[in-house]
Amino acid sequence: MSRGPRNVQATDRAIASALGRMSVLVLLYHGVRPDDAQPATTNLQAKHVSQSAFAAQMDWLIGAGYRFIDGDELRWMSKARSLPRGPAVAITFDDGYANNHSCALPVLRPREIPALVFLVGAFVDRGEPLWVDRLEQAVMSARVPELTVDLNGARRTLTLAGAPARKAAESSVRSYCKRLPATARESVLQELFAGLDAPSSPLPALYRPLRWDEIDDLRHAGWTIGSHTMTHTILAGLTAAQARREVGEAKALLEARLGDQCDLFAYPNGLRGDFTEETQRVLAGLGKTCALASVEGRVTRRFEPLAMRRVAVHDRMGLAEFKVRTTGAVGVAKSVKAGLRTAQSALRRRRAG
């Protein structure tokens, strides 16, 4: 006999309660899109979830007994090095897409759910499209069958024959460009754009940044505003001075425009290797009290305030997978695999020596 909805919800609440005694869940979103079909050339990385899926996820969290925490509680966690009463969850958005206001807010406001959004300074202030979105759109709308470009010091020819090949080409260029400082990255992109012969049309509305009046509306709805650097450049590849400028300029911009201290931060990309101890010293020197990474997992009792884990949510994730990921099991599995690889490498080195 299958379990009824009440029994399922009771189980969900029991699991959430048990996890909440020793950890906090921080969810990472980028955008929320309308439910109507999107063009095949957009949302390749599935970082904009459908509005109906987002609503279902929020309703499941409510039904499982989660308490939604805001920026003030994250600050308290960082300063006290302690966890709030659980089960607790924070809803976070990176980059600053306009659909955070047009699609996410209508889901969160009636449910009285607070959120945090981490803004890329140049994106929201100057309306400069994020380079990853410019790349995605240019590759997917290119009018040439292939492209030769310098990647990692070598000339590579990328085929663009069909959607799968275009997605693979976009992924290769994106992975390479992520490791470059902003100026070098822009040089690579300009060479690539010149050879793609893509239409010079505006980017789809999905990629539009928040306006300042929309940001103010989010604040009035209980959202906390944090920074995500000035140009979305991975900090580990920068000198301390460059990192200080990337973080400091965005912090100064947001504080000047919003009139509040901007002490919360999210790392661009945010995976292991994308930030270092030196990066964390730069953040601390600029008054950052809490920094969120993209390393998968829940925030446990021994967390680092300047490297708090999150669980990323994407558009291809069904509710069943969402439930599993909220437990942090995927992050644990990844950590175990990484540990095994490290141990195996060490063993091979000892044998070779």
Describe each region flagged by the PLM:
Residues 27, 60, 84-85, 97, ...:
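CE4/NodB-like, metal-dependent polysaccharide N-deacetylase domain
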Residues 121-124, 297:
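Short beta-alpha junction loops
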Residues 93, 201-205:
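Short, flexible loop segments at the rims of nucleotide/cofactor-binding pockets, characterized by
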